[in-house]
Every structure is written in C-alpha cells, then in structure tokens.
Amino acid sequence: HTQRRRQRQMCIRDRFKISSNSKTIKSNFKEGSKVIVAGRLMSRRIQGNASFAELQDSSGRIQVYFNRDEICTSEDKSKYNELYKRLLDIGDIIGIEGELFKTKVGEKTIMVKDFKLLSKSLKPLPLPKTDAEGNVYDEFTSPELRYRQRYVDLIVNKNVKDTFIKRSKIISSIRKSLENEEFIEVETPILQPIPGGAAAKPFITHHNSLNIPLYMRIANELYLKRLIVGGFNGVFEFAKDFRNEGMDRTHNPEFTNLEFYVAYKDYNWMM
C-alpha cells in the first residue's frame, strides 16, 4: 500500500502561493470571492461527477466542493476522473483555487476551479469511523501512541493544537512581563564541565576533541548568577534541563525550566 502511494507522488509541486486560510474565509466570508488555499484532505464523499470534501489547514477546517465540469472545462476529464477520484488519498495535502459559495443548508464552501497535489500521505491516517448507530471506532486515543506520534495526534485530534497555542502565548506573555521589568533574556551552556545548581544526577557525555567528560545541564542557576555578578541587574532564561533520574507522567528527564535572577531585591519583591 505504501509503495502504491509513493508512485502517486509524480504530480507533487514544490511551491504553492496561498491567499487565505479556513478561519479567515469563514470570518470574512463574501460569496463569489476567489481564494487560494492549501491543506490536508480529511474526508470526502464522491457522488459520480461531484464530490464534497473537508480541507484542514493550520487554522481549522472548511468544506470544499469538487465538480468535474467546473475543474475540467474541456473534453479532457482526466484531472477529476484520474487525479481526484483515483490518485488522491485521505491525508494528502492539496492546493485549491476556487470561489466561495453557500450550500442549500448554509454551509460556507469553496467551489474548486483548480487543484494541485502538494504532498502525498504515504500511510493512511488513523481517522475515527462512525457506524449507522452513531458508535465511534478506531479513535486515536492511546496515550502511548499519542505521545510517541504527536504529529499524528495533531492531525486527527483537533483540541491538541490548542494546547500548543496556549503554551506559546503563556511563554510570550511571561517573556514580555520580564522584559517590561528590564530583565535581559540570555542563553547559558547546556554542556557543562561540572554539573551544578541542583541535587540531581546528570546525563554524561564525552567531548572527543578535548577528550574530557561533559555533563548535560541539570540547572542553569550558576551561570545566571555569574551574569548578575558581571553587572546585569536582571536576567532570565527559558532553559532545557536534563536529569538522569526516575520518570512518571509529571516527571520527565528532559524539561523546560524558567529561571530568573535580579540584583538589589529580596524574596518578597520576587514573590
């Protein structure tokens, strides 16, 4: 099956210029407007010469409508009959040019005028299936698989991306708050000759050129304090720390740590 999908890569494009995304289209919808979008094909319902499908991009999902005669205006109908119906698979990334319209039930939809295959999905997506009674099967819910294949989790579980977005906004807000207090963001060494700053067991590696052992950072405290000694009033760092210890759901050997230090203040001011 993977080999068959690889053979379908011949029509892939390296570059595709988009003009909008699904979220912007829905919020600023204007019937008849021309749009160029790209995203992953998540579902489709083929009914002869026409087909409704769902396209997912970084901002959400939108319905798209494929009509053979709209796409293939000449006598040659192979683009719809061969490329769309036979060569495209769920999970493929495609680029679409089309016009906006609403269906009879009011669904905001893109009428496809042209489309291109941008990237081939070599393996089928683990999409959930619903039977006639409404029972859902084959959901991608295994915690082990979700953690090890986060890219698949992001594709098939819509709420996961929100966690990434919230984390980014939280870090951005913390950074702005510290910068408003005139803290300087810095970077300190990850490979250190002496592990310090915390009572933890380090990961050990070896520097071949210098022929010395090095330790992956367990804390960035000591280097930040040296910068305060050097004359900075306030410093902070979002640091990756590594501790070669036990692990559970809340304790990972690799984690992100925020540390900040300031001169001429006490712990009451810090709190």
Question: How would you name each of these model-derived features?
Answer:
Residues H1-I12:
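Single conserved hydrophobic/aromatic residue that forms the stacking wall/gate
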Residues R15-W269:
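Class II aminoacyl-tRNA synthetase-like tRNA-binding/catalytic domains
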